[in-house]
Amino acid sequence: CIFVAHNVKFDANLLAEALFMEGFELRTPRVDTVELAQVFYPTFEQYKLSHLSKVLNLDLAQAHTAIEDARATGQLLFHLMDKIASLPRQTIEMLLTFSDNLLFETELVIRDAIRGQNLGLSKEYVMLEESGIVLRRPVAYKAERKLSQDFATNIALLDLESRPKQREFAEAVRKELDNTAISMIQAQTGIGKTYGYLLPLLAQADVDKVVVAVPTKLLQNQIMNQEAKALSDVFNINFHSLKGPQNYIKLDAFYQTLLRQDSNRLINRYKMQLLVWLTETETGDLDEIRQKQRYMAYFDEIKHDGKLKVDSLFAEYDFWQQSYQKAQEARVVVTNHAYLLTRMEDDHDFVRGKTLVIDEGQKMVLALEQFSRHQVNLTVLLQHIHRILDSGSQSLLQQRLLENLQFEVSHLIQEHQQ
């Protein structure tokens, strides 16, 4: 007999207290479905039973009712067991090296799942032999379907209804495509402008590749999860979300943390969560992990720094390198204002020959301001001036200029400290 609950620590204490009053003890193993859900559904936003019930279609008519909660928890456990059983055996074996960090006897569910598991690895996965880490194999792109020249037809194929203002905006975009100069189009919010500019662009045979820049990463993720997903599903359009390297997991750094003994239970649970996530993700984008804010120091340790050693175990499967390669091949690249500026500084040809759409262009000015700022550490600068003056190697003119600079910098520091 095993006691299973969603937040087992709380429920087990209540049950143990009730049994104690009757002269009994609770000695059965205890399994927590909250921690199991956190490990095996790494991209979920929440792990409340009510939220999991909506996402997984569990039977929970009335939350916080004992019978209803128990039924939904039982269904959740079956979902979790199926999910664990679907994972590669190699991943489950790695999970078991950290599973004693789960509450009470929760690891029993994982140990039970490995029995009868196939030793072979499915074609959808690839195992990096020396590390034992299993990744999802990249999926080949399907042949793109041709879009109609009629905006309303394309919207209908997406199972959406076109709106008058949206059609007007789309028509304005279509007309401007013949104009080789920069076009500026104003549109009110809430008209569905993302489809309004994407569909006319993608319908044009002479528009080869498109770069879309939006103000924030939040909007970037939103487009990828909504409009890009729909267009990819219906028309097989190849979209790619491009961000700075720090947004992606660095497999070398993650592997080093797997080799390390950590006493922090939360860190070890994150290691388990990431091992599961790596069998699912096609991007390696850490934004897919919604609960990472609980221990950002660990994620700062494993995020990419934009560098990759030639002899890296993961050179062939590095997510940041793959992301940049995918950006070269994608029909539509979605990025954000800040990273567009960074990318164009590093690669002057990044948008050459492509159609560039700057969504909410008025906000690009703010991004440019931020991008062009340079920081100077006044204390370090003052120390440097002192060293030069102490060396006595400068001419009289240089000495006077440095003394004036020394005075001004000292004055600035004093003003700041007041």
Task: Outline where the language-model segments fall.
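Walker A/P-loop NTP-binding motif
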Residues: 175, 194-207, 226-230
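Acidic, Mg2+-coordinating catalytic module of metal-dependent nucleases/exonucleases
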Residues: 2-19, 44, 48-111
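Signature of the SF2 helicase/ATPase Hel1-core->accessory helical subdomain module
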Residues: 313-331, 337-418
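Conserved beta-strand -> loop -> alpha-helix junction used to position metal-binding or nucleic-acid-contacting
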Residues: 25-38, 212-215, 235-251, 352-364, ...
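Conserved pre-motif I regulatory segment
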Residues: 139-184
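Acidic two-metal-ion nuclease catalytic site recognized across multiple nuclease folds
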Residues: 79-150
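A substrate-engagement module of RecA-like helicase motors
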Residues: 152, 208-210, 214-330
